[in-house]
């Protein structure tokens, strides 16, 4: 291949992949009426509803979530739509206020995981060599531990609090971003237009940002959504075990921990927090799985081909 042809091909393909956000969003809009698109919109709608519920908690909650408003274990009915827990607190009010903690931890933990795992995956996959081997060894060592168990150990070391729990969960999911991004980068860097850009002496940073990153960008929202769903369950598990938040802060996992032993006498105090954990987790999973079908059509076709051949 002549240098001029290589330069032209790299430039043309660079323009094609140079705007990942716009291309991904346009592709999503085209597929928004498909089955996968409908699933994504359902998930987004549920997540947005929970976000607005958390933001408007001071106006939506009928009672103070930490105030005793009736006799303990009063069943649902009348002014107490979801009943009263064993502490005499309104379950509905604690559900509404308790949405704030999972959402805050999702935002912080997934952002930290993305901010660390993405550049490490790009660097490891593109540079290779000794750096790649070291990073893979470290990430595989972290990934080998069960997520909740590792989060428990980290939370026990660094202590309670929203930020500390977010950091503990973030550390658990950094290897997920790293592994997926690294594998994609290892494939993309072998493409002719990337090799042409390198042969022309283009700086590595520019090659990564202009040619490599746009081609792995479709994986980011998928990983982000799935990890967000996992973060909800991990946060609930930590607070259930008493490793999450200080007492007195409304939280769905803490409410389950507080009331589960009295399930037969006041099932509502455990059922409704668990139900909202299930709803939020399912909604985020809908978003992740739907985006995976929309943004990774080659993977979908490959899976279909493998199924047919089997």
Model-derived segments and spans:
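Transmembrane alpha-helical segments of polytopic membrane transport and secretion proteins
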Residues: 1-46, 286-310
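Hydrophobic alpha-helical transmembrane segments of membrane transport/permease proteins
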Residues: 4, 45, 49, 53-87, ...
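Lipid-exposed faces of alpha-helical membrane segments in multi-pass integral membrane proteins
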Residues: 42-56, 108, 112, 116, ...
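Generic hydrophobic transmembrane alpha-helix motif, especially the helices
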Residues: 81, 85, 91, 115, ...
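Transmembrane alpha-helix signature in integral membrane proteins
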Residues: 91-126, 279-280
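Glycine-rich helix-loop "coupling/hinge" segments at transmembrane-helix boundaries
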Residues: 143, 154-157, 184-185, 233-277, ...
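C-terminal transmembrane helix and the adjacent membrane-cytosol boundary/short C-terminal tail
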Residues: 172, 218-228, 267-310
């Amino acid at each position: 291949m002549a240098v001029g042809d290589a330069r032209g091909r790299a430039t043309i393909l660079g323009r094609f992949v140079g705007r990942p956000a716009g291309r991904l969003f346009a592709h999503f809009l085209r597929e928004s009426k498909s089955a996968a698109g409908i699933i994504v919109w359902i998930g987004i709608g549920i997540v947005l509803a929970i976000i607005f519920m958390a933001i408007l908690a001071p106006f939506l909650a009928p009672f103070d979530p930490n105030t005793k408003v009736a006799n303990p274990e009063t069943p649902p009915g009348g002014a107490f739509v979801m009943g009263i827990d064993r502490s005499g607190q309104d379950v509905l009010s604690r559900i509404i206020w308790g949405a704030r903690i999972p959402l805050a931890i999702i935002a912080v933990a997934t952002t930290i995981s993305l901010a660390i795992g993405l550049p490490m995956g790009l660097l490891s996959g593109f540079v290779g060599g000794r750096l790649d081997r070291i990073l893979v060894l470290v990430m595989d060592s972290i990934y080998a531990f069960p997520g909740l168990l590792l989060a428990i150990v980290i939370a026990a070391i660094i202590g309670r609090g929203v930020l500390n729990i977010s950091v503990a969960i973030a550390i658990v999911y950094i290897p997920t971003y790293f592994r997926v991004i690294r594998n994609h980068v290892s494939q993309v860097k072998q493409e002719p237009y990337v090799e042409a850009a390198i042969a022309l002496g283009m700086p590595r940073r520019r090659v990564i940002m202009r040619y490599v990153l746009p081609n792995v960008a479709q994986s980011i929202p998928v990983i982000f959504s799935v990890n967000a769903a996992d973060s909800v369950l991990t946060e609930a598990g930590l607070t259930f075990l008493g490793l999450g938040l200080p007492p007195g802060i409304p939280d769905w996992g803490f409410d389950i921990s507080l009331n589960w032993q009295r399930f037969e006498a006041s099932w509502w105090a455990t059922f409704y927090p668990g139900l909202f954990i299930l709803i939020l987790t399912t909604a985020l999973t809908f978003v992740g799985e739907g985006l995976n079908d929309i943004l990774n059509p080659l993977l979908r076709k490959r899976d279909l081909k493998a199924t047919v051949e089997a």
